[in-house]
Amino acid sequence: MGEIKVSPDYNWFRGTVPLKKIIVDDDDSKIWSLYDAGPRSIRCPLIFLPPVSGTADVFFRQILALTGWGYRVIALQYPVYWDHLEFCDGFRKLLDHLQLDKVHLFGASLGGFLAQKFAEYTHKSPRVHSLILCNSFSDTSIFNQTWTANSFWLMPAFMLKKIVLGNFSSGPVDPMMADAIDFMVDRLESLGQSELASRLTLNCQNSYVEPHKIRDIPVTIMDVFDQSALSTEAKEEMYKLYPNARRAHLKTGGNFPYLCRSAEVNLYVQIHLLQFHGTKYAAIDPSMVSAEELEVQKGSLGISQEEQ
């Protein structure tokens, strides 16, 4: 049990990448926690947004791999926000504080929904250059919990944890998926009542994405085709919403592929970010991009333009 928590990779990550805490709101209790790794010269990094049960370190395998390839990566943990507008306003202030004009966002589950809402919120003065949506959704009504969204703040922590755990895989899983679930349960245990209640509120509060406001943003939809908390209908809705999105399909990986199928997830992230190499919105250090990769990028751009 708890293999990931005691793994050399995780311990090396915790020992080398500092966890920063930043306050951008008037309320001092609203603290953003984040890992910022890779070259600071990159002004359009990739930012990871976790699911309800996650902390910033659930993306440690992406941080280690992507920074090794020259990318700047930031993984976040949310303060306690109770509605989407408050979250979006706080996230905008955080980007201002970090002096980041535009960013790429990778959002897992709730993180993906919040990434879309932030892109929608800033559509008149865009802050989101691209989106990678992993096991995500575009309408909170799929959870049939909108009627309870206003009462999560009243519930004790053990009850909230029970609600979240109800979405974790209960059937047979392979050892890597079992380790990922153990790690996420451990992360869930580290969250306080208000953190959990606010995230569940954001996850279930009646809201949907307005696609016409973000239709020009490049999107990759990353889906897992075994047991995950998302229904097939929710996935189909995402495909309809983003008809031009790239699709990254993983045969297995459950709810947490970034932990148990990290090599595949990292490859799909690289493929997504490749389209921005050689531009001012590249998330990678230019010295790490080979001339050959730039040529491949130009070639693939030429092909996609011919197809249009």
From Swiss-Prot:
Keyword field contains Cytoplasm: yes
Phylogenetic placement of the source organism: Eukaryota, Metazoa, Chordata, Craniata, Vertebrata
Function: May play a role as a negative regulatory factor in CD4-dependent T-cell activation.
Tissue specificity annotation: Expressed in all tissues tested, including heart, brain, placenta, lung, liver, skeletal muscle, kidney and pancreas. Expressed in J.CaM1.6, HuT 78 and HeLa cell lines (at protein level).
Entry's family note: Belongs to the AB hydrolase superfamily.
Cellular compartments per GO CC: cytosol; endosome membrane; Golgi apparatus; intracellular membrane-bounded organelle; trans-Golgi network transport vesicle
Cross-referenced PANTHER family: ACID CLUSTER PROTEIN 33, MASPARDIN
Effect of S109A: Abolishes interaction with CD4
InterPro entries xrefs: AB_hydrolase_1, AB_hydrolase_fold, Maspardin
Phosphoserine: residues carrying this PTM: S304
Pathology linked to this chain's protein: Spastic paraplegia 21, autosomal recessive: A form of spastic paraplegia, a neurodegenerative disorder characterized by a slow, gradual, progressive weakness and spasticity of the lower limbs. Rate of progression and the severity of symptoms are quite variable. Initial symptoms may include difficulty with balance, weakness and stiffness in the legs, muscle spasms, and dragging the toes when walking. In some forms of the disorder, bladder symptoms (such as incontinence) may appear, or the weakness and stiffness may spread to other parts of the body.
GO MF assignments: CD4 receptor binding
Membrane topology per record: Peripheral membrane protein
Domain AB hydrolase-1 intervals: 87-159
Subunit structure: Interacts with CD4. Interacts with ALDH16A1.
Keywords: Cytoplasm, Endosome, Golgi apparatus, Hereditary spastic paraplegia, Membrane, Neurodegeneration, Phosphoprotein
Designated name of the protein: Maspardin
Pfam families according to UniProt: Abhydrolase_1
An individual GO BP term: response to epidermal growth factor
Annotated compartments: Cytoplasm, Cytosol; Membrane; Endosome membrane; Golgi apparatus, trans-Golgi network membrane
